[in-house]
Amino acid sequence: MCLVTGRAVAEPTAPAGSHSKVLSTNCSATANLTYENPPVLTGTIYRMGSTSGQPLFKFKRTATRSGNRIHVLREFSYPDGKLAARERVVYQDNALVHYELDELQIGARGTADVEQSANRNKAKIHFHYSKDASTYSSTAAKTEPLLLDTLINDMVGPFLAAHWDQLAHGEKVGCRFIIVPRRETVGFTFRKESETQWHGRDVLILRMEPSSMLISALVNSLHFVIEKNPPHRVLEYSGRTTPKLSSSGHWTDLDAVTVFDW
């Protein structure tokens, strides 16, 4: 998962009474787009409870812009440089268009493609996923409606910054999260857990937990260390990450700590 950067993909008009800060998807060619910065972001992934031992993986996010389209490459590598997992993301203006997951450790591949519509209620997400990448092209699509504040991991950081005032005042903020291996979105809620200092910086600790009790049994709560001063960057993230860990000859989901190099 490795949550780093976030904002919603939806029409630019929120429902009446909504607190959502929806970003306009109609941007000029010279406007700064939400997901184009930083051009390069790196991080290190450690075992839970230790950020000083041997790293498990290295993370690198690279963003390039062509007109109003942003292409993002997210790579997860072993310390020796070998790729463990790769994600590709495409945004048009500030809206998600395409998300692709290559789980190179287990040979799986999946995608989520957004079909926008002038009628926001008719926008859709099309999912494909195969445990065998060689059979990916023959997998059947699974489709669900695109709801407001639907995110992928790359969109979480900006999403939290956009809802900073609510979170800082103790309000809960909800989202739908795209999980390609499940070919669906899952509801999550963010809330402030505490305020503290992190390496001399004033920070908030935010907790992200599934809205469903069923999903809560499968995924532990996730935690974000976010600087209190603008631009409210995610400094550290603890929870489910994209690469897996080999244990007794089997690949298992990995909960880990990711420290970002801001």
Where are these predicted regions, by residue range?
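Acidic, serine/threonine-rich low-complexity disordered tracts
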Residues: P12-D93, Y99-A118, K172-W262
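Bacterial N-terminal signal peptides
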Residues: M1-V4
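Solvent-exposed helix/loop surface patches that form functional interfaces
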Residues: E36-P38, K122-D202
